């Protein structure tokens, strides 16, 4: 059986305890600290690194080349460690340095809105936005697979000798 695909969560949602234990999640953060001996890395939220940090267990994805202050995306399961702290057990760890974080955040919010709309009852249309109009159809006589210059001489490209 395949593992669950993972729901996107912002790093501060995970560190604030808004994600239930055992959930499969996707999140991101800047590599703040990597302890190779314990197979643990600390990811910090890019906007507030001193306030929001996540522990990530890396024993399933090692060896990997760790770059401090680079942006990483992680797919894994949220577990509780001895002592009560939460850790994300990484199944997939990807360096995504250079990714547009504001665009990623917008995409996550848009995906959440879409999923919420899909979960609403069909009769409850009061909270749904009006759908966009369908695109205009193109007349079938304007569609042609033939080249426009049929029967005309096409000059060959010039070559330099």
Curated annotation (Swiss-Prot):
Gene3D superfamilies (UniProt xref): Nucleic acid-binding proteins
Compartments it resides in: Nucleus; Chromosome, Telomere
UniProt feature, compositional bias: Polar residues: 126-143, 150-161
One GO cellular component term noted in the UniProt record for this chain: nucleus
DNA-binding region: 1-120
Region of interest called Disordered, as start-end residue ranges on this chain: 119-161
UniProt entry keywords in alphabetical sequence: Chromosome, DNA-binding, Nucleus, Telomere
InterPro entries: NA-bd_OB-fold (IPR012340), Ten1_animal_plant (IPR029146)
Ranges that cross the membrane: none
Major subcellular location class: nucleus
A GO molecular-function descriptor: single-stranded DNA binding
Role this protein plays: Component of the CST complex proposed to act as a specialized replication factor promoting DNA replication under conditions of replication stress or natural replication barriers such as the telomere duplex. The CST complex binds single-stranded DNA with high affinity in a sequence-independent manner, while isolated subunits bind DNA with low affinity by themselves. Initially the CST complex has been proposed to protect telomeres from DNA degradation. However, the CST complex has been shown to be involved in several aspects of telomere replication.
SUBUNIT field: Component of the CST complex, composed of TEN1, CTC1 and STN1; in the complex interacts directly with STN1.
Family per similarity comment: Belongs to the TEN1 family.
PANTHER family named in the record: CST COMPLEX SUBUNIT TEN1 (PTHR33905:SF1)
The protein's name: CST complex subunit TEN1
